[in-house]
Amino acid sequence: MKDIDCYKIKKINIPGVAEFYDVIAKTLNGRELKPMYIGACNVPCLCPYCYSKLKSVPDLDYVPNKRRKDFYYTSDGFCIVSQKFKDFCDEGRYGNLDFQKLNTSDFYFFEPHEIFKTNIHWIPFNEFKIWCNACKNYAELTGGVLKDESFKLETNDFIMRTDNFYGKYENKHPMIVVGLETERKMKDFGLKGIDFDNVYG
């Protein structure tokens, strides 16, 4: 974290995260696929009060409508990856990763188990709406990813997921975070369809 001039933050009232923090990792974003579930009421593991997705439970009978890239998100927030993406993770010996093969293709639902702790309260870098006392989450959380100051990274080569789910209601999902060295390796491996966005800390 860079030295922060608190007076300057107060004066402009719009803190710029890139001005006060360093880029320490990247999130993975991809092209959009059709929804895995038709209708919000059919998405599993929603809070019954605010309808936020609390856990990603894939339908393994899902058929991707695009198959030319290595990394996708469905429009309802499920990460779908290719066999090549899985090969990259296997060859790199990245641990604590969940790959569930889809029944009709050589694609997988993908989610890391290792948690990247985030700070969601840097406004306006993040926007959050509708706090739910039942599930202890915001029904809407949008914006970028900022590392929590208490969370220490021990390596620059990792694949994790955020502790918070980003997005709105049933479409929320954890963001996948990789180290800067991992980003380089993914590019060298030739993985297609991945957009890398900055993670600050």
Segments from the language model and where they lie:
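Phosphate/anion-contacting hairpin/loop surfaces
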Residues: 1-201
